[in-house]
A protein has these predicted regions:
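Conserved structural position within tetratricopeptide repeats
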Residues: 32-33
Length: 61
């Protein structure tokens, strides 16, 4: 199960809720590299980038 996308999304979500945005961003980026079509991942990637004031255009679908 830990290799499943859903599992990784839950882990990233936990870090996001703990306000560890850097760790969360790293995990979402890893998910994006493996699954660029995952809309949940894309949505949170853009959201975190906006919060951190970093460019997010490459993730816009």
């Amino acid at each position: 199960q830990p290799k499943e996308v859903k599992w990784k999304l839950m882990v990233a979500s936990c870090y996001r809720r703990m306000n560890d945005l850097d760790k969360s961003l790293k995990i979402y980026e890893e998910i994006y590299q493996e699954n660029p079509e995952n809309l949940e991942c894309l949505r949170f990637l853009v959201q975190i980038c906006q919060q951190l004031n970093i460019p997010y255009e490459e993730y816009n679908a």
